[in-house]
């Protein structure tokens, strides 16, 4: 195992040999400030979803429905790595930063595709983690921040890639790892942990953005005596999972960060009777102190592996002639949730299924708490089939929102279901702690009589009604980008296409086949008045796992090549 000091020395060595004269041709680096994060320029993409509200929307419109058919690749860059490339390219005035599987960061001239530097992290041989990916970096001042799969937070010099500091967030040996892009606000860099299948106790932690000193740590499972602890019997709270593995949203007015939380552990709810707060919830944390201000639990005593880790989109919408200061969450459980956010409270407004869902029978009209068809709830020694599958109506790929058209765009999967049965499992630190019995074809099946799986859906947030759906035979693992050019960009299908859709009706206006399937988050930026679209291709992780199961179920042998490439597109000069 490499110690921290050796890691820093080696990483610095690799940065120094690849540092080139490219940086000399770029403008001086523009430090990222609180003001720039709260009011991001349309020419840049400074954070995971482009803005604190997680809209995934850009006001750039040079590329639009009238000319997108002319879009062409202007440069590409091979990462040299396999597995799932899921991170967005983060762009600051010509400097692009892309993270990859195995915790590399590549700094690139966003005009030309020339590499400026590369950070290589050397990971310990005994690392146990379920998802060898990374979902992006964060920027602040003249630094780049990375959350690593060996559970460290690293601060690097944005111009050279030299490590400034790194801190251990938790001990990876106990099953903790990180895949999310950090969230920076209120002078803190905030991260959450993965490991819900490895017997962890989830949390969100904050560190001083300049020094790395710990600021606060808030667990997602309350300890005995804390509010909500009664929902965890005995010692189950110590190993109950509830990870936080996607970047949160942030409301500067309330100084509150909103985070999604994952499944309880083991998977079968009968091993931990109770609601299991704050699993499968949105939690509101004070960015200064970490205090839990409010929560909404989407479903209780999860037994389906339906993580609800996607951060809610902060959207103010109309209901009954009134404006709701709202949050919208397309749930993994297959329901589209509309909530209201107050400074110290989250209120349920309404929710409806956006894919076929056969577990919930009713929702409480005041709280949104679902009741279940218990024949659809697997348990220890009890097999149950349910829809949607364990990957849900939408897994981690983020939705996007156009505030002008009022349309929310959801990358959905319909008509796929799971069969699961639980078995007893013994806890061992850092080892799988799921308690799921083996099953034929992984317990995966497609609903009879259906002809597609993947979808791109558009919903009007003010009416709560679906506007249109575009369907694909393939599953869909494509994050979504929306632009003022009335366009939606998405990859995600197993045919390796990256597509542009008419945001008004879902018509495919342009498509480009790439080297691999696209599970990266697309972004847009502009330089010298010219708009670019950027995305990473690179199939792997759960998209490939689901493909393997579909091949078994359908009797097919559909092969999706792996290999990461950063693609950048623009209109011809």
Predicted regions located by residue number:
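Blade/loop signatures of beta-propeller domains
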Residues: 24-73, 220-227, 370-376, 445-446, ...
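Repeat-blade elements of multi-bladed beta-propeller folds
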Residues: 45-49, 84-104, 128-153, 177-201, ...
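N-terminal cofactor/phosphate-binding cores enriched in small/glycine residues
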Residues: 54-170, 482-483
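Extracytoplasmic beta-rich repeat domains
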Residues: 77-90, 118-138, 166-181, 198, ...
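Short loop/turn segments that connect beta-strands within beta-propeller blades
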Residues: 109-112, 157-160, 209-211, 287-289, ...
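Beta-propeller blade signature
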Residues: 202-213, 275-290, 454-461, 553-572
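Loop/turn-rich, solvent-exposed surfaces of beta-rich toroidal or solenoidal domains
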Residues: 414, 442, 448-507
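Blade-level signature of beta-propeller repeat domains, shared across WD40, Kelch, NHL, RCC1
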Residues: 523-573
């Amino acid at each position: 195992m490499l110690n921290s000091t050796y890691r820093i020395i080696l990483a610095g060595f690799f940065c120094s040999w690849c540092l080139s004269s490219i940086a000399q041709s770029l403008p001086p680096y523009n430090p990222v400030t609180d003001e720039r994060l709260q009011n991001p320029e349309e020419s840049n993409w400074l954070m995971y979803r482009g803005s604190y509200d997680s809209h995934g929307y850009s006001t750039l419109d040079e590329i639009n429905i009238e000319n997108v058919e002319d879009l062409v690749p202007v440069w590409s860059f091979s990462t040299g790595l396999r597995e799932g490339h899921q991170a967005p390219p983060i762009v600051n005035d010509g400097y692009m930063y892309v993270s990859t599987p195995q915790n590399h960061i590549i700094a690139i001239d966003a005009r030309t595709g020339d590499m400026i530097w590369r950070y290589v992290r050397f990971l310990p041989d005994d690392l146990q983690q379920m998802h060898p990916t990374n979902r992006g970096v964060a920027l602040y001042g003249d630094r780049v921040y990375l959350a690593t799969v060996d559970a460290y937070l690293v601060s690097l010099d944005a111009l050279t890639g030299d490590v400034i500091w790194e801190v251990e967030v938790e001990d990876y040996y106990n099953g903790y790892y990180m895949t999310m892009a950090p969230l920076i606000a209120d002078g803190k860099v905030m991260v959450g942990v993965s490991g819900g299948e490895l017997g962890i106790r989830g949390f969100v932690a904050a560190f001083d953005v300049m020094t790395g000193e710990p600021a606060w740590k808030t667990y997602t499972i309350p300890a005995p005596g804390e509010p909500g602890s009664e929902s965890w019997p005995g010692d189950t709270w110590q190993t109950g999972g509830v990870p936080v593995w996607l970047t949160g949203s942030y409301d500067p007015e309330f100084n509150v960060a909103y985070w999604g939380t994952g499944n309880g552990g083991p998977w079968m709810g009968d091993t931990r009777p109770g609601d299991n707060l704050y699993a499968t919830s949105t939690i509101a944390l004070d960015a200064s102190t970490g205090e839990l201000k409010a929560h909404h639990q989407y479903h209780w005593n999860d037994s389906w592996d339906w993580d609800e880790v996607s951060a809610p989109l902060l959207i103010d919408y109309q209901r009954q002639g009134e404006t709701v200061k709202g949050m919208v969450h397309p749930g993994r459980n297959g329901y589209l949730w509309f909530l209201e956010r107050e400074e110290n409270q989250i209120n349920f407004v309404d929710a409806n299924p956006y894919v076929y869902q056969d577990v919930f029978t009713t929702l409480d009209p005041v709280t949104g708490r679902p009741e279940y068809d218990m024949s659809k709830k697997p348990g220890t020694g009890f097999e149950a089939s349910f829809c949607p599958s364990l990957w849900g109506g939408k897994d981690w790929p983020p939705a996007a929102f156009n505030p002008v058209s009022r349309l929310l765009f959801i990358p959905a999967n319909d008509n796929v279901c799971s069969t699961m049965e639980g078995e007893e499992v013994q806890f061992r630190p850092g080892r799988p702690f799921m308690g799921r019995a083996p099953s034929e074809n992984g317990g995966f099946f497609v609903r009879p009589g259906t002809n597609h799986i993947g979808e791109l859906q558009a919903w009007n947030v003010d009416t709560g009604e679906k506007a249109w759906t575009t369907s694909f035979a393939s599953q869909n693992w494509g994050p979504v980008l929306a632009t003022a050019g009335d366009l939606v960009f998405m990859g995600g299908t197993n045919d390796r296409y990256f597509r542009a859709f008419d945001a008004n009706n879902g018509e495919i206006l342009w498509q480009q086949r790439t080297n691999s399937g696209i599970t990266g988050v697309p972004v847009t930026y502009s330089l010298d008045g010219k708009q670019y679209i950027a995305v990473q291709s690179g199939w792997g992780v759960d998209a490939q796992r689901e493909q393997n199961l579909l091949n078994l179920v359908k009797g097919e042998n559909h092969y999706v090549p792996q290999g990461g490439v950063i693609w950048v597109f623009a209109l011809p000069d």
